[in-house]
Amino acid sequence: MKVVLVGEESAGLQVLRAVAESKHELAAVLATPPGPQSAGFNLWTVAQKMGYETLPAGQVKKAEFADQLRAKNVDILLNVHSLHIVHRDVVNAPRLGSFNLHQGLLPRYAGLNTVSWAIFHA
């Protein structure tokens, strides 16, 4: 199965490693390019070191990115801890679908710091 990963931070890294160790093909990784303060272990850097095609995460906001997914015959798009709103055409482009992996109970704990808010309201 061909997978495209859109992600950030440790959640994105965990999914990157899980897909890399699976029988599935990682067709591309979309993440935020490292800045001057990056520690060198962000998703972009790790994916590049592992040899994966790396693209700016903001591409998912553009309808035309759906054409790239279809051209690659992508089966699944995984969106993990990304701050970008994925364009509807991009969501619908993968053959089997797109999946948003979110650590909070949606819609109540949408956004940032979901775990902290869940504990606060417990």
Regions found by a protein language model. Give the residues of each.
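One-carbon transfer enzymes
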Residues: M1-A122
